[in-house]
Regions:
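Small-residue-biased structural context
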Residues: 2-160
């Protein structure tokens, strides 16, 4: 397959746009990077890209959850369950005996983009509005949360 044909085979690519911002710089930067990783999914490097994506999702979820917990976000447990459900869906997809094909890569990209946009524009945006509307400035809270990995998602995929 030629490079031109390969590029035509990537119909479900969604670019980051400012409309996806939730108002928390660290989270917005992490979301932007997630879109970049999803966009990079292709058959030639799928295993490497999926590994990198999972590692980054572990870090992002951990950071986001730490912010929620530290700030006393009332919907923290609910949000945590959404992350766990996502992890289970990804585990099911990756646990399949099917090998990687162009169609399967497209299916994964479509699922990830749809989930990311839906999650960011509803649940993460709700958190962003809640946090930024609080009388206590959110900047110190965000700076206190060091990037880390762990939790349910890390255990599910054998990450440390």
């Amino acid at each position: 397959m030629t490079t031109e044909a390969t590029h035509k085979r990537v119909p479900f690519v969604i670019e980051w746009r400012d409309g996806f911002k939730i108002g928390i710089d660290q989270v917005d930067q992490e979301h932007r990077h997630l879109f970049t990783l999803v966009r990079a999914l292709n058959l030639a490097s799928v295993d490497h890209t999926v590994d990198e994506l999972l590692d980054y999702v572990v870090t992002h979820f951990s950071n986001e959850q730490a912010m929620m917990e530290k700030s006393g976000y009332p919907a923290f447990e609910q949000h945590l369950k959404l992350h766990e459900e996502f992890a289970a869906q990804v585990a099911e997809f990756l646990g399949s005996d099917q090998g990687w094909t162009e169609d399967r890569v497209q299916e994964m990209r479509k699922f990830l983009n749809k989930w990311l946009i839906g999650h960011i524009m509803t649940h993460d945006l709700r958190f962003g509005k809640w946090l930024t509307s609080r009388p206590v400035p959110s900047a110190p809270l965000v700076q206190q949360v060091a990037p880390k990995s762990g939790g349910f998602f890390a255990r599910l995929f054998g990450r440390k």
